[in-house]
């Protein structure tokens, strides 16, 4: 599994102050642009992409309806994604499929989409349908993060992930059970077939995240022969 760490600057000054060397242990950087005012995102973008030049990077606009910090109309959402994609070519672009399904066709030319679904309230009963619909669209990566309230919630998502990965070995998945009880899903990614696990450096970007240092130790232990 690859370890992903999010950067969440709230201003140009915070973006410029980021120390890229602190993130060297992360395999991929996620830029959570939703922590900025929407009119500042394109102004801050050059600083982020210069700071992490040569690193794999995910561009994410996590909207409030899916647990993020910003509200965007479909037109604003698509415009910002297309502008960043055109000028900076991030390795991955997160797209909130269920929040912006009506404009998804405008993204069909982008081969590096992370089609995502986030639910900070529960693990919905229709998880299999969600995973199936996202898989059929054949994105670069399917990402599902849902809140776990019981151990069974966690086991269900892990089992679904393993099943879908077995049936679709070429498709990459990232599935996360959020919350304290869901922490185990973050360290068993290789078993379930999940390609990434999100870790924190300073500030967590989702409930239940484990520190990057701890995740590195866990990965080293799991990788031992």
UniProtKB/Swiss-Prot annotation:
Reaction catalyzed: 3-dehydroquinate = 3-dehydroshikimate + H2O
Pathway assigned in UniProt: Metabolic intermediate biosynthesis; chorismate biosynthesis; chorismate from D-erythrose 4-phosphate and phosphoenolpyruvate: step 3/7
Entry's family note: Belongs to the type-I 3-dehydroquinase family.
InterPro entries cross-referenced by the UniProt entry: Aldolase_TIM, DHquinase_I, Type-I_3-dehydroquinase
Binding site for 3-dehydroquinate: 6, 30-32, 62, 186, 205, 209
Active site: 118 (proton donor/acceptor), 143 (schiff-base intermediate with substrate)
Enzyme class: lyase
Species for this entry: Streptococcus pneumoniae (strain ATCC 700669 / Spain 23F-1)
GO biological process per UniProt: 3,4-dihydroxybenzoate biosynthetic process; amino acid biosynthetic process; aromatic amino acid family biosynthetic process; chorismate biosynthetic process
GO MF entries: 3-dehydroquinate dehydratase activity
CDD domains: DHQase_I
One Pfam family named in its UniProt record: DHquinase_I
Protein's recorded name: 3-dehydroquinate dehydratase
HAMAP family: AroD (MF_00214)
Function: Involved in the third step of the chorismate pathway, which leads to the biosynthesis of aromatic amino acids. Catalyzes the cis-dehydration of 3-dehydroquinate (DHQ) and introduces the first double bond of the aromatic ring to yield 3-dehydroshikimate.
Native organism taxonomy: Bacteria, Bacillati, Bacillota, Bacilli, Lactobacillales
EC number(s) per entry: 4.2.1.10
Alphabetical keyword list: Amino-acid biosynthesis, Aromatic amino acid biosynthesis, Lyase, Schiff base
Subunit structure: Homodimer.
Highest taxon listed in the record's lineage: Bacteria
